[in-house]
Protein backbone atom coordinates (compact mmCIF):
# COMPACT_ATOMS: atom_id res chain seq x y z
CA UNK A 1 0.00 0.00 0.00
CA UNK A 2 1.21 3.53 -0.73
CA UNK A 3 0.18 6.95 0.52
CA UNK A 4 0.94 10.63 0.55
CA UNK A 5 1.89 11.79 4.05
CA UNK A 6 2.25 15.58 4.21
CA UNK A 7 2.86 15.54 0.43
CA UNK A 8 5.61 12.92 0.81
CA UNK A 9 5.21 9.65 -1.08
CA UNK A 10 5.54 6.63 1.23
CA UNK A 11 4.98 2.90 0.87
CA UNK A 12 4.03 0.44 3.61
CA UNK A 13 6.39 -2.50 3.94
CA UNK A 14 8.05 -4.98 6.26
CA UNK A 15 11.66 -6.21 6.14
CA UNK A 16 12.69 -9.86 6.55
CA UNK A 17 15.95 -11.69 7.05
CA UNK A 18 15.54 -14.67 4.67
CA UNK A 19 18.04 -16.76 6.65
CA UNK A 20 16.58 -16.39 10.15
CA UNK A 21 12.98 -15.52 9.28
CA UNK A 22 13.08 -12.43 11.55
CA UNK A 23 10.68 -9.72 10.38
CA UNK A 24 10.43 -6.02 11.24
CA UNK A 25 8.01 -4.97 12.39
CA UNK A 26 6.85 -8.26 13.89
CA UNK A 27 3.23 -7.30 13.18
CA UNK A 28 2.10 -4.85 10.55
CA UNK A 29 4.16 -2.53 8.40
CA UNK A 30 6.24 0.65 8.52
CA UNK A 31 6.15 3.68 6.23
CA UNK A 32 9.16 4.01 3.93
CA UNK A 33 9.85 7.28 2.12
CA UNK A 34 10.14 6.95 -1.66
CA UNK A 35 13.40 8.56 -2.81
CA UNK A 36 13.90 8.48 -6.58
CA UNK A 37 17.37 9.97 -6.10
CA UNK A 38 18.50 6.89 -4.17
CA UNK A 39 19.58 4.21 -6.62
CA UNK A 40 19.71 1.41 -4.03
CA UNK A 41 17.06 -0.98 -2.77
CA UNK A 42 16.27 -0.10 0.86
CA UNK A 43 17.85 1.98 3.62
CA UNK A 44 16.79 1.18 7.20
CA UNK A 45 17.63 2.61 10.65
CA UNK A 46 20.70 1.14 12.34
CA UNK A 47 18.80 -0.33 15.29
CA UNK A 48 16.46 -2.22 12.95
CA UNK A 49 19.44 -3.40 10.88
CA UNK A 50 21.09 -4.78 14.04
CA UNK A 51 17.86 -6.47 15.18
CA UNK A 52 17.38 -8.25 11.86
CA UNK A 53 20.83 -8.83 10.44
CA UNK A 54 23.41 -8.79 13.27
CA UNK A 55 24.25 -12.48 12.69
CA UNK A 56 25.26 -11.86 9.07
CA UNK A 57 28.52 -10.46 7.76
CA UNK A 58 27.76 -7.08 6.21
CA UNK A 59 29.27 -5.52 3.12
CA UNK A 60 30.37 -1.87 2.95
CA UNK A 61 29.40 0.38 0.05
CA UNK A 62 29.97 4.00 -0.84
CA UNK A 63 26.94 6.22 -1.41
CA UNK A 64 27.33 9.54 -3.23
CA UNK A 65 24.79 12.20 -2.25
CA UNK A 66 23.35 14.78 -4.64
CA UNK A 67 25.70 17.44 -3.23
CA UNK A 68 28.73 15.22 -3.89
CA UNK A 69 29.31 14.13 -0.30
CA UNK A 70 30.14 10.48 0.22
CA UNK A 71 28.78 8.18 2.92
CA UNK A 72 29.71 4.61 3.76
CA UNK A 73 26.82 2.20 4.17
CA UNK A 74 26.83 -1.36 5.37
CA UNK A 75 24.32 -3.92 4.27
CA UNK A 76 23.26 -7.44 3.44
CA UNK A 77 20.80 -9.06 1.09
CA UNK A 78 17.31 -9.23 2.57
CA UNK A 79 13.64 -9.28 1.67
CA UNK A 80 10.96 -6.62 1.55
CA UNK A 81 7.35 -7.64 2.04
CA UNK A 82 5.20 -5.21 0.07
CA UNK A 83 1.58 -6.25 0.00
CA UNK A 84 1.62 -9.79 -1.36
CA UNK A 85 4.96 -9.31 -3.11
CA UNK A 86 8.30 -10.46 -1.73
CA UNK A 87 11.22 -8.54 -3.20
CA UNK A 88 14.91 -9.37 -2.68
CA UNK A 89 17.66 -6.80 -2.62
CA UNK A 90 20.49 -5.10 -0.76
CA UNK A 91 19.22 -3.72 2.55
CA UNK A 92 21.61 -1.18 4.01
CA UNK A 93 22.03 1.37 6.77
CA UNK A 94 24.06 4.52 7.31
CA UNK A 95 25.05 6.20 10.54
CA UNK A 96 22.34 8.47 11.96
CA UNK A 97 19.51 7.22 9.74
CA UNK A 98 16.17 7.19 11.56
CA UNK A 99 13.73 6.39 8.75
CA UNK A 100 13.10 3.77 6.07
CA UNK A 101 13.90 4.84 2.49
CA UNK A 102 13.05 2.96 -0.71
CA UNK A 103 15.17 3.45 -3.79
CA UNK A 104 15.00 2.84 -7.50
CA UNK A 105 16.26 -0.75 -7.26
CA UNK A 106 13.14 -1.65 -5.24
CA UNK A 107 10.74 0.57 -7.19
CA UNK A 108 11.77 -0.62 -10.66
CA UNK A 109 9.30 -3.51 -10.32
CA UNK A 110 6.32 -1.15 -10.05
CA UNK A 111 4.26 1.39 -11.90
CA UNK A 112 3.69 4.35 -9.58
CA UNK A 113 0.88 6.80 -10.27
CA UNK A 114 0.78 9.89 -8.06
CA UNK A 115 -2.04 12.43 -8.21
CA UNK A 116 -1.34 15.31 -5.83
CA UNK A 117 -4.65 16.98 -6.77
CA UNK A 118 -6.64 14.00 -5.52
CA UNK A 119 -4.01 13.05 -2.91
CA UNK A 120 -3.92 9.52 -4.26
CA UNK A 121 -1.17 7.04 -5.04
CA UNK A 122 -1.36 3.76 -6.96
CA UNK A 123 1.43 1.22 -6.83
CA UNK A 124 1.03 -1.66 -9.27
CA UNK A 125 3.44 -4.46 -10.17
CA UNK A 126 4.85 -4.43 -13.69
CA UNK A 127 3.77 -8.03 -14.26
Regions found by a protein language model. Give the residues of each.
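Pepsin/retropepsin-fold aspartyl endopeptidases
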Residues: 1-127
Amino acid sequence: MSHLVDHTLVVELAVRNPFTGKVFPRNGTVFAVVDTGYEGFLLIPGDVFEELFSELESEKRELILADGRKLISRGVYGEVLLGRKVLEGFVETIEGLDEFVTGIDLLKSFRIEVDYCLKSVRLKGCR
